[in-house]
Structures are given as structure tokens and as C-alpha cells.
Amino acid sequence: MSVHIGAKPGEIAEHILLPGDPLRAKYIAETFLEGAVCYNEVRGMLGFTGTYKGHRISVQGTGMGVPSISIYVNELIQSYGVKTLIRVGTCGAIQPDVRVRDVILAMSASTDSNMNRLIFRGRDYAPTADFHLLRTAYDVGMEKGLALKVGNVFTADMFYNDEPNWETWARYGVLAVEMETAALYTLAAKFDCRALSVLTVSDHIITGEETTAEERQTTFNDMIEVALEAASRNDA
């Protein structure tokens, strides 16, 4: 056991999906994994391990934001030997050509979080996805005919921000805003692991367009399938 994960050694696979919502983890396990078994209920942050097309895969809720995902990623890697981590979550678009329900593969992540500034003593670090995971996920998306976008996302420390300045980030090509990817990529690099964020555009920050519950469910499935295929095809 680690501090926040109650799994025994060997109960967590080397390849894992990371939704923020623990109920989304439960949905993924019940819908996509065979023989899924719950290994964690600590703090209600559910975790499961099963198989996908014969490959052993885990799924673990992480909560929201940089501090929360950092706790789980640290423990998954250091205490349980996880090697491949794929975030599956939502984001808000800030580009006019990025549409609600599109799937974004986060090639890199800008951030206003101070975590990396503390680690690198005030200098800027560029959190970046694993190329092989990114390429595989892109190929899967093309095979499925999905509306994929690949590029930089912005990891925000605040969900409610009175002065977000999205226009500046959009002008520099940032596709969307979320709250975890920069931390995931930084920690994966630190521990020589592979990481990728596969994100569904659930709303458009500039236009105000949103998805319905039914539309979210369908699009989330596309995102989850891309992530599962990327994890299983990179199972070396």
C-alpha cells in the first residue's frame, strides 16, 4: 500500500488510464475491461485492473488539478511500477477551429502552476508527451475517423479565474484548457515513464457552446477507446 492507494503489490498493471472522476474510472472498467477488479477505494478514488484485448490495463481516478494528479502519479510510479500513464479527461476549447466533441492529443502543456517553477528554481520547463504514445493514438484516431487535434494545451491552476487571459494563450496556438497534463508529463519525464493526455472538448470557452450529457457519453467513448488502443499497442 501507498499513502493514498490501497492496492497490494502486483494488483496494478504497468499501463494505466487516469480519469479525474473516480466514477469515470468505474465506467471504463465496467464497459471496456474484461474481468475488472477494484483494487482501491481509499478516499473514494476508485481504481480497477482488468484486460483489454488480452492486455492487462488499470484505470485510476486522480481527482482534479495539479496537486491531486501529482499525488497519484508519484505513488503509481514509485510504489507500483507503472510505466505508461494516459490521462483521459475533458477540456475547454479556446481556438475557433477546435469544435465541441473533438478529441485533442496534448503534444505539450503550458501552465500557470508554480510546481515546475519550484522544481526548476524559477526556470521554465516544457512538459511534453511521449512521442510513441502520441503517434499511436493519432494513428488510432485516424483509423476510427475521429476529428482529432494535436497540439499545446494549457494546464490551469484555477477553475474559476476572474482574469484568465485566454485570448493571449489562443493567439500563441494553445488549443484548450484543462487542469492536469503539465504535472503528468513532468512527473513521467522525471521517472523515465511514458505519458499522454487524450482529451475530449466538452465546451468552448470563447463561444459558450456545451455538450449534452448524451453527447458527452458518446464522445467520451471515442477518447477512451483511443487511449486503450494506444496503451495496448505500446505494451512491450
UniProtKB/Swiss-Prot annotation:
Catalyzes the reversible phosphorolytic breakdown of the N-glycosidic bond in the beta-(deoxy)ribonucleoside molecules, with the formation of the corresponding free purine bases and pentose-1-phosphate. Homohexamer; trimer of homodimers. GO terms for biological process: purine nucleoside catabolic process. It holds the Pfam family PNP_UDP_1. Belongs to the PNP/UDP phosphorylase family. One of its GO terms (molecular function) is purine-nucleoside phosphorylase activity. It catalyses: a purine D-ribonucleoside + phosphate = a purine nucleobase + alpha-D-ribose 1-phosphate; a purine 2'-deoxy-D-ribonucleoside + phosphate = a purine nucleobase + 2-deoxy-alpha-D-ribose 1-phosphate. The active site is at D203. Its EC number is 2.4.2.1. Transmembrane segments: none annotated. It comes from Geobacillus thermodenitrificans (strain NG80-2). Keywords: Glycosyltransferase, Transferase. GO terms for cellular component: cytosol. The gene is deoD. This is Purine nucleoside phosphorylase DeoD-type. A purine D-ribonucleoside binds at H4, E178, M179, E180, S202, D203. The record marks R216 as: Important for catalytic activity. Phosphate binds at G20, R24, R43, R87, V88, G89, T90.
